[in-house]
């Protein structure tokens, strides 16, 4: 390469650098000018926006000030109106006080005038009394002088004469008053009883000793009986109820005098029929479950009864005992219905006489509570009822009402008399009771009572309408020979103490169970 060529290359390079510099400078100046213009435009826009915001803020401030001014003026007007009203009320009160003061002044003037008049009259009366006393003394002296009798002697003569004349009239008036009082008392008593009876509408209850369980088909009867009768025998043994399986289509009859046992057997048999699995172990399970259900139902009946009658605050155990009356009858009359009826009647009569109706209802509801206890507890239902009421701290009037409603004790309150009257009314109404059914049930209860009075007896059941009594004994207390002796002793005692038609079969059952579990 020649020096000329190198020189030319250097010159061209320098020329290119100079041209590039001027081009970049021109471009940079153009960009700076554009940026300056944009900045000026942005600044101008910002100024315009700031001015607009300023104007808008001023307008809003003016509106706010105007609104506040209007609200303040409105509040001032309201306060002025309220002050004006208060001022008017104060003026009205001042006027009323002025009028009252004027009235008080007038009354004070009238009272002063009357007081002055009364003082004058009092003075005049005292003067007249003095004159009358003086005249009486003068007349007495004159009479004593004329009759030659002293004042006391004359007074005694007059009193004796008046006493003789009035004694006969007093006796007649006393007799007439007594007769009128008796007539009025009888009339009022009849009126109170009629009102109470009209206001208390009760059902005529007639309890039976059988229950019917419907079956889905007649094939179920064979399953209930079981192989060699083991199912029906287990159910009868556990419940003490007779199962009558006859030609009645799709039905089994449960017969027994104890309604609680009968209801337990009915529920258990219903569950077994619905479940379909009928065997001794399942029967025992269902009977136990049914007993718990009956216990729950008894408690619910007690609570429902206290709610319907309006008696509150009873002890929970007493409520459960009250519910047992649902399954008790007296001469065919349901005892719970009878107790409710007595409570209503006693409460109505107490209201008519102005006595405590709530306490009368309480006493009426609990008057037969002793009938809920089984015959295992000795004593009459009155004695048991008094013991229960005392145990659960009932009111003394309630305890006396229970003790006196059959005349065993003297009633100490009107409520006790009303409870006895209500008890008689409820029992005496037509159709309320049946003597035959009650005697039959008592005979069955006596059968069980005699059987369970012997040592070693676990439980007993009177079945077959009282023609058989089955006695379950404890196998560890009585052996086979003693079981025969026990049957003879019970048979002899039944013959000595009971009157009954036909024959009574005494069956003593001694059962030993051995249970093991394979693991």
From Swiss-Prot:
The keyword Oxidoreductase does not apply. The keyword Cell membrane applies. GO terms for biological process: mRNA catabolic process. One of its GO terms (cellular component) is plasma membrane. Keywords: Cell membrane, Endonuclease, Hydrolase, Membrane, Nuclease, RNA-binding, Transmembrane, Transmembrane helix. Gene3D superfamilies: Hypothetical protein af1432 (1.10.3210.10), K Homology domain, type 1 (3.30.1370.10). It holds the Pfam family KH_1. One of its GO terms (molecular function) is RNA endonuclease activity. Residues 209-272 form the KH domain. CDD domains: HDc, KH-I_RNaseY. The chain crosses the membrane at residues 3-23. It is a single-pass membrane protein. Residues 335-428 form the HD domain. SMART domains: HDc (SM00471), KH (SM00322). Its EC number is 3.1.-.-. Endoribonuclease that initiates mRNA decay. This is Ribonuclease Y. The gene is rny.
């Amino acid at each position: 390469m020649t020096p000329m060529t190198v020189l030319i290359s250097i010159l061209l390079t320098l020329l290119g650098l100079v041209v590039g510099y001027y081009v970049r400078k021109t471009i940079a100046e153009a960009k700076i000018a554009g940026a300056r213009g944009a900045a000026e435009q942005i600044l101008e826009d910002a100024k315009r926006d700031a001015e607009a915001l300023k104007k808008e803020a001023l307008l809003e401030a003016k509106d706010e000030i105007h609104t506040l001014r209007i609200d303040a003026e409105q509040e001032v007007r309201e306060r002025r109106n309220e002050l004006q009203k208060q001022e008017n009320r104060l003026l009205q009160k001042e006027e009323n006080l002025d009028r009252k003061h004027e009235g008080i002044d007038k009354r004070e003037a009238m009272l002063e005038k009357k007081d002055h008049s009364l003082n004058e009259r009092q003075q005049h009366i005292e003067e007249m009394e003095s004159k009358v006393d003086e005249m009486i003394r003068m007349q007495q002296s004159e009479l004593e002088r004329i009759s030659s009798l002293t004042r006391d002697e004359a007074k005694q003569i007059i009193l004796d004469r008046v006493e003789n004349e009035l004694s006969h009239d007093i006796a007649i008036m006393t007799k007439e008053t007594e007769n009128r009082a008796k007539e009025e008392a009888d009339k009022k008593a009849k009126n109170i009883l009629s009102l109470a009876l009209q206001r208390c509408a009760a059902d005529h209850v007639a309890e039976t000793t059988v229950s019917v369980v419907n079956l889905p088909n007649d094939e179920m009867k064979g399953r209930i009986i079981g192989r060699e009768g083991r199912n029906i025998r287990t159910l009868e043994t556990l419940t003490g109820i007779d199962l009558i399986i006859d030609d009645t289509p799709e039905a089994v009859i449960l017969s027994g005098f104890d309604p609680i046992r009968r209801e337990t057997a009915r529920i258990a048999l219903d569950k077994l029929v619905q479940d379909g699995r009928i065997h001794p172990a399942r029967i025992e399970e269902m009977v136990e479950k049914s007993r718990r259900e009956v216990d729950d139902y008894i408690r619910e009946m007690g609570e429902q009864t206290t709610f319907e009658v309006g008696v509150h605050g009873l002890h929970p155990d007493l409520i459960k005992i009250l519910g047992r009356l649902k399954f008790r009858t007296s001469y065919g009359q349901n005892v719970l219905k009878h107790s409710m009826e007595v409570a209503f009647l006693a409460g109505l009569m107490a209201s008519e006489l102005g006595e405590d109706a709530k306490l009368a209802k309480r006493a009426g509801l609990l008057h037969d509570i002793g009938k809920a206890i089984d015959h295992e507890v000795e004593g009459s239902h009155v004695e048991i009822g008094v013991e229960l009421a005392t145990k659960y701290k009932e009111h003394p009037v309630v305890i006396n009402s229970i003790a006196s409603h059959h005349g065993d004790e003297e009633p100490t309150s009107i409520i006790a008399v009303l409870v006895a009257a209500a008890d008689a009314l409820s029992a005496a109404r037509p159709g309320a009771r049946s003597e035959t059914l009650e005697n039959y049930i008592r005979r069955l209860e006596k059968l069980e009572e005699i059987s369970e009075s012997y040592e070693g007896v676990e439980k007993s059941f009177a079945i077959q309408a009282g023609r058989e009594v089955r006695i379950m004994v404890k196998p560890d207390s009585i052996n086979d020979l003693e079981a025969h002796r026990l049957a003879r002793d019970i048979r002899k005692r039944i013959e000595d103490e009971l009157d009954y038609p036909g024959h009574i079969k005494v069956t003593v059952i001694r059962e030993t169970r051995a249970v093991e579990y394979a693991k």
